[in-house]
């Protein structure tokens, strides 16, 4: 598939193994939710696997690839999920897949690696003489396999150019929100952050939930106004502002 235009945003998620599907699914959901908040119509997602076959995970949960990874010669964003234990899976990955990742990176694709997916990025040569983050459980192994790469042991996430690294299978929301801001703006990022960070003890989160309680309806015009109120950078919203946004009279 050829390079997308500026009106489209293509995301390809590589699910390397049947474990830790959350590293892929939740990353896609963060971006998809942000695209909905931003009312971005050209958002496209694809899921691929190393052998182009379905993956079976815990409890019989399966991931079906929507395309073959070889069919993409460009994507705006490539998300590489956790590969589980690298000792069991890293050497089983087709060398051509590493070449593909390198080519995408050279063409300007953003490469997001989550948890032990960082091993894949390292083996593809994207971190040579550079820095990385890694889950503490696999940090020693990473140091043995890639001694030339400096591990930032006090960090959980790292962004270097078009490479985005998150060290845990369930702690990648901050990295994904950075991408949300780059493509959809700061206000959509803030909205997504509030949506993801709802905590019972947080007064701000509670008030945010109160707002969403009033958005459980199908009136498209009212929903448009409600989303606009949530994302606008105005401190005070007047009746005139609402009327202009809704293309209605103030009455």
Residue ranges: model-predicted function:
Residues 111-112, 132:
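A short beta-strand/loop micro-motif in the catalytic core of glycosyltransferases
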Residues 154-195:
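Conserved anion/nucleotide-ligand pocket segment
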Residues 8-11, 131, 162:
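Residues that mark the start of a beta-strand
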Residues 128-156, 192:
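A conserved active-site-flanking secondary-structure segment within enzyme catalytic domains
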Residues 1-111, 120-123, 181, 186, ...:
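Extended, subdomain-level signal for the structured scaffold at the beginning of enzyme domains
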Residues 59-63, 147-149, 166-167:
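Short, surface-exposed amphipathic charged segments that create phosphate/polyanion-binding patches used
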Residues 87-88, 120-123, 129, 141-142, ...:
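Short, well-ordered, mixed-charge alpha-helical segments that flank or form enzyme active sites
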């Amino acid at each position: 598939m050829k390079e997308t235009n500026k009106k489209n945003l293509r995301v390809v998620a590589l699910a390397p193994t049947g474990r830790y599907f959350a590293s892929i699914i939740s990353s896609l959901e963060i971006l998809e939710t942000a695209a909905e908040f931003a009312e971005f119509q050209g958002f496209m997602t694809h899921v691929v696997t190393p052998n182009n076959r379905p993956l079976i995970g815990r409890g019989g949960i399966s991931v079906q690839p929507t395309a073959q990874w070889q069919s993409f010669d460009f994507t705006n964003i490539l998300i590489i999920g956790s590969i589980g234990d690298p000792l069991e899976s890293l050497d089983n990955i087709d060398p051509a897949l590493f070449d593909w990742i390198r080519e995408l990176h050279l063409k300007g694709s953003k490469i997001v690696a989550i948890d032990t997916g960082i091993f894949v990025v390292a083996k593809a040569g994207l971190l040579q003489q550079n820095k990385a983050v890694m889950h503490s459980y696999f940090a020693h192994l990473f140091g043995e396999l890639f001694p030339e790469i400096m591990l930032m042991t006090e960090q959980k996430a790292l962004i270097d150019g078009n490479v985005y690294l998150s060290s845990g299978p369930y702690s990648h929301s901050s990295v994904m929100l950075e991408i949300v801001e780059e493509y959809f703006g700061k206000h959509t990022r803030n909205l997504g952050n509030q949506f993801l960070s709802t905590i019972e003890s947080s007064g701000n989160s509670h008030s945010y939930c109160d707002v969403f309680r009033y958005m459980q309806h199908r009136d498209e015009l009212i929903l448009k106004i409600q989303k606009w109120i949530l994302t606008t950078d105005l401190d005070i919203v007047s009746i005139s502002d609402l009327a202009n946004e809704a293309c209605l009279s103030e009455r």
